[in-house]
Swiss-Prot record:
Keywords assigned by UniProt, alphabetized: Aminopeptidase, Cytoplasm, Hydrolase, Manganese, Metal-binding, Protease
Species of origin: Paraburkholderia phytofirmans (strain DSM 17436 / LMG 22146 / PsJN)
Enzyme Commission (EC) number: 3.4.11.1, 3.4.11.10
The name this protein goes by in its record: Probable cytosol aminopeptidase
GO MF terms held by the record: manganese ion binding; metalloaminopeptidase activity
S-S bridge residues: none
Gene: pepA
Top-level taxon in the UniProt lineage: Bacteria
Upper classification of the organism: Bacteria, Pseudomonadati, Pseudomonadota, Betaproteobacteria, Burkholderiales
Family the UniProt entry places it in: Belongs to the peptidase M17 family.
Catalytic activity: Release of an N-terminal amino acid, Xaa-|-Yaa-, in which Xaa is preferably Leu, but may be other amino acids including Pro although not Arg or Lys, and Yaa may be Pro. Amino acid amides and methyl esters are also readily hydrolyzed, but rates on arylamides are exceedingly low; Release of an N-terminal amino acid, preferentially leucine, but not glutamic or aspartic acids
């Protein structure tokens, strides 16, 4: 799809191309009120009160999510007008805007309309700007049109009529809106990559497949890539990472990608993504019901690849490193057993009390490896704990950090990107739950505060830099009829990096 921006003076709707421009359809928002404003007022005046008459007749009341097509309206250049109910104006926040946008896209996607003039981004969204509305609309459309059918014998490649979307904004918003459109397309492309990787079955998306995907990404976007095999990881004394792959015939891959958009010596942001391409639980075997969804246990890795793709497409002026420890966690005669003790790259010994708490075992060595980049910040992303789902459900990702400034940046980014996260505690008192009689620490801390103790475990390997942990177990994919990867938290991570790139620290 092609996205473009058309700037105009909205106070002169009928004389500057806003209403007279040719297209298949123009999308107009109508608030739940007898008083028209914005684009709706302009179109009402241009049509001698048509909208006023429609509202009085009860055909469109402006209630949230309602839509109405008008055909061949005199005085309007578009062949059709799509009216979209926006609800109450004083409650028109980012959620209400998202609902309205999705209602509009659904109505349009059911037609043969090819080109649309879209005005909803210029509506008065509470605490948001028109450029934010442009980007959000692009992401909503791309989410609605995403389909994963490539594993079917006859993939569904039904061509959609809708090809071109022109966002109509005020002249003063043009520059920001053009940047937002570019960002929206890049984010959508990154999210699609993340979704595709998550939705692939684990017999296709193996650690080697992730490594090959990283290599292709590096070739396409001029990134630097290095893939360490098991012998190289042994030489680096990554005993914790390698303990997880011990039961699998699939070779582990330790993937490192580098994007150089900032100054050569500028400290990078490092993203570490959990890449367990299938998690049976190992010897601590999971129940069979729902185990198919454990192909999504590599969504942290997928989000790192998707974010790097988006960053490269946007050309952000900062340095980013992606680290992906990729393994399968399988039971076999050679698998790590409960009670085994392994030695991490940092030198700390770990008693593996539960082999299904494997994500932290691969992440801890990746976090130690990250030290060599002298990072400005490190963020790990992992489908780490079911406890996080119990705590937060499927709306917020769990955020853990002892660095208030870094946590604040990530929370601000989550709100701006509509990719919410919630900060959870990381108090030192929880560390006591990880004590072991036989090793420096255990890999689990019991049932209480399971997501917190998992983060506490990771924190033991992050003394050298500012660090945050995102537990995306509840947000990386959906179950049930809408089963599939969500592409989260690519928007959050990308927004964090956009904000960092706008800060002088990123290029120094």
């Amino acid at each position: 799809m092609d996205f473009s921006i058309k700037a105009c003076d909205w106070t002169k709707g009928s004389s500057n191309g806003f209403l007279t421009g040719k297209s298949d359809c123009i999308v107009i928002g109508v608030f739940e009120s007898q008083t028209l404003s914005g684009a709706a007022l302009e179109i009402d005046e241009a049509t001698r009160g048509l909208l006023t008459r429609i509202i009085k007749a009860g055909d469109m009341d402006g209630k949230a999510g309602t839509t109405l097509f008008l055909h061949e309206v005199s005085g309007i250049g578009a062949s059709r007008v799509l009216l979209v109910g926006l609800g109450k104006q004083d409650a028109f926040n980012q959620k209400a805007y998202g609902d309205a946008v999705r209602a509009a896209w659904r109505a349009l996607l059911g037609t043969k309309i090819v080109q649309v003039t879209f005005t909803l981004a210029q509506a008065p969204i509470l605490e948001r700007t028109a450029d934010w509305g442009v980007r959000a609309a692009i992401l909503a459309l791309r989410e609605l049109t995403y389909k994963f059918t490539q594993m079917k014998s006859k993939p569904e490649n039904a061509a959609r009529a809708l090809k071109r979307i022109v966002f109509s904004v005020n002249t003063g918003d043009e520059k920001a809106a053009k940047l937002a459109a570019k960002q929206g397309a890049a984010l959508a492309n990154g999210m699609d990559l993340t979704r595709d990787l998550g939705n692939l079955p684990s017999n296709v998306c193996t650690p080697t497949y992730l490594a090959n995907t990283a290599k292709k990404l590096a070739k396409d976007w001029k990134l630097k890539v290095e893939v360490l095999g098991e012998k190289q990881c042994e030489a680096l004394k990554m005993g914790s990472f390698l303990s997880v792959t011990a039961g699998s015939v699939e070779p582990a891959q330790f993937i490192v990608l580098q994007y150089q958009g900032g100054a050569a010596k500028a400290a990078p942001v490092v993203l570490v993504g959990k890449g367990v391409t299938f998690d049976t639980g190992g010897i601590s075997l999971k129940p069979g019901e729902g185990m198919d969804e454990m192909k999504y246990d590599m969504c942290g890795a997928g989000s790192v690849l998707g974010t790097l793709r988006a960053v490269a497409e946007m050309g952000l002026k900062l340095n980013v490193v992606g680290i992906i420890p990729a393994v399968e966690n399988m039971p076999s005669a050679t698998a790590t057993k409960p009670g085994d003790i392994v030695t991490s790259m940092k030198g700390l010994t770990i008693e593996v009390l539960n082999t299904d708490a494997e994500g932290r075992l691969i992440l801890c060595d990746a976090l130690t490896y990250a030290e060599r980049f002298k990072p400005a910040a490190v963020i790990d992303i992992a489908t780490l704990t079911g406890a996080c789902i119990i705590a937060l459900g499927h709306h917020n990702s769990g955020l853990f950090s002892k660095d208030d400034a870094l946590a604040g940046e990530l929370l601000d980014a989550s709100r701006e990107a509509s990719d919410p996260a919630w900060r959870l505690p990381l108090d030192d008192e929880y560390q006591d739950q990880l004590k072991s009689n036989f090793a420096d620490l255990a890999n689990i801390g019991g049932r209480p505060a399971g997501s917190v103790t998992a983060a506490c475990f990771l924190s033991r390997f992050t003394d050298a830099y500012p660090w945050a942990h995102l537990d995306i177990a509840g947000t990386a994919w959906k179950s049930g009829a809408a089963k599939g990867a969500t592409g989260r938290p690519v928007p959050l991570l990308a927004q964090f990096l956009i904000d960092r790139a706008a800060d002088g620290r990123a290029t120094q």
